[in-house]
Amino acid sequence: MTLNNGGKANERGSNENPLQALSKNEAFLVPEFLDTAQSKEKAIASKVSNTLHMSTEESEFPQQVSSTPMFSENTVHPRHEVSPKPSSKNTQLKQENISKSSGYSKQTNYSNTPKSLAKTTHPKQGSTLKPATNSTHYREDDIPKSSEDIIQPKKGDRPKSSEDIIQSKKEDRPKSSEDIIQSKKEDRPKSSEDIIQSKKEDRPKSSEDIIQSKKEDRPKSSEDIIQPKKEDRPKSSEDSVPSKKGDRPKSSEDSVQPKKEDRPKSSEDSVQSKEGEVHKPLKDSIQSKETKVPKSPQDSIQSKEDKTHRPLKDSVQSKESEEPKSSHESIQSKEDKIHKPLKDSIPSKEGDIPKSPEDTIQSQEEITASEEDTIQSQEGNTIKSSEEDVQLSESKLLGLGAEIETLEEGLVRVIKDKEEFEEVLKDAGEKLVAVDFSAAWCGPCRMMKPLFHSLSLKHEDVIFLEVDTEDCEQLVQDCEIFHLPTFQFYKNEEKVGEFSGALVGKLERSISELK
């Protein structure tokens, strides 16, 4: 370890002379183990925080913990354009830095590769060429920082640099991690959602603007940051290395503050340039997203809402206007067709839509009223017709009954006593008198009675008499009636024929023969 540090101190002897004197005088093995152990813990914690933080955001937009929000936001899109530059720089810097930090590659692997691994492993999902660019620039940026700023104070001020860097790591990683994580928390909804939306929608703008901003800002960020790192690293190495001797909180503050200042200048300038450029591409792309994305999601949603609301409002209003016009017009035309035969016209369609159900209800009431009237008229007509028919039939029946009664009264004479019977026989003279002895309770008598009346109509020269056996008991005894019905025939007051029973043919033959 000491040979490599001595070799590296000899390699870097032109720029960083205070570190060589410090590297020869002071032992640094204990702060190495302190740095490696604490950098392992913090690298593991940074890995845990990065993996926990990046696990939720690996699918959307992976960003690095400490300083990769600069490059992750800036180097989102130019994967294919910037990757040949850091690939050559990767190999050269890896060869130079492996040759330089071969002894400290373990420490830089323990100290910086958790940064680079935590910073380079996660962006491989989202931007594998980006961490190549970012890790190479970050290796250009941080391995000279880590190799020169951290390794050389391991030569000179490992007690101070380890404590100060540990303190600066204790002080600055919550600042850098919390602030950058908060900036990630604050910027990733902006960067991840907006850049993802800018990836989805404004990759020509965001990629061209960010590629141009990367082409403009990589001379600014890479050259300006690398040059102030090259300029500030002699400053930060000369300033921070003596300040690492005395003022490593200055170097940690100055180096961390240039990390805070440069990274806020790089991160803020690059992040602000990212916020400015990401916000410019994000604001431009977000504004273009707000112009495009809100035009596409919001304006497209609003335009969709406008288009949907305009086609929906216009189409819905047109549908409301057309559906009230089409449906209401068709309904109203149906209602007009229904109401025009019912109520002849409905004037305003929109005003009369409440009128149309009322009118339809009223028309239905009128229809029901007309139906009731027709039903009542039908009932009245049917009742009237049925009553009239019944009355006509009853009148006809009554007329027939009256005729029958008149026939009965006129043609068949009912005998009530014996004196009347003898008087009729005297008045008849030589005419044939047919007498029917019957009773109301006798069934064959009721059956023969209509036939007897019909024969009285047929034979006008024959006198037909009817005797109720219950009313004229004395006459029944005198005439010796033993069966019902019994028919007797008289001529010149003398009995000429007689038979008993409901014999229709014999009755007709007897009347025709004895007449």
Swiss-Prot record:
Pfam families assigned: Thioredoxin
Protein known as: Thioredoxin domain-containing protein 2
Matches recorded under InterPro entries: Thioredoxin-like_sf, Thioredoxin_domain, Thioredoxin_H-type-like
Region described as 21 X 15 AA approximate tandem repeat of Q-P-K-X-G-D-I-P-K-S-[PS]-E-[KE]-X-I: spans on this chain: 92-405
Phosphoserine modifications at: S14, S39, S146
CDD domains: TRX_family (cd02947)
Gene name in the database record: Txndc2
Chain's role: Probably plays a regulatory role in sperm development. May participate in regulation of fibrous sheath (FS) assembly by supporting the formation of disulfide bonds during sperm tail morphogenesis. May also be required to rectify incorrect disulfide pairing and generate suitable pairs between the FS constituents. Can reduce disulfide bonds in vitro in the presence of NADP and thioredoxin reductase.
Ranges of biased composition (kind: Polar residues): 61-75, 85-136, 375-384
Tissue occurrence: Testis-specific. Strongly expressed in the testicular seminiferous tubules, mostly in the round spermatids.
Keywords of the record: Cytoplasm, Developmental protein, Differentiation, Disulfide bond, Phosphoprotein, Redox-active center, Repeat, Spermatogenesis
One Gene Ontology cellular component annotation held by this UniProt entry: cytoplasm
Cystines in this chain: C442-C445
GO biological process, one term: cell differentiation
Location relative to the cell: Cytoplasm
Sequence repeat windows: 92-106, 107-121, 122-136, 137-151, 152-166, 167-181, 182-196, 197-211, 212-226, 227-241, 242-256, 257-271, 272-286, 287-301, 302-316, 317-331, 332-346, 347-362, 363-375, 376-390, 391-405
Keyword Aminoacyl-tRNA synthetase applies: no
Biased composition range(s): Basic and acidic residues: 137-293, 302-358
Location of the region described as Disordered in the Swiss-Prot/TrEMBL record: 1-23, 51-390
GO terms assigned for molecular function: protein disulfide isomerase activity
Location of the Thioredoxin domain: 398-515
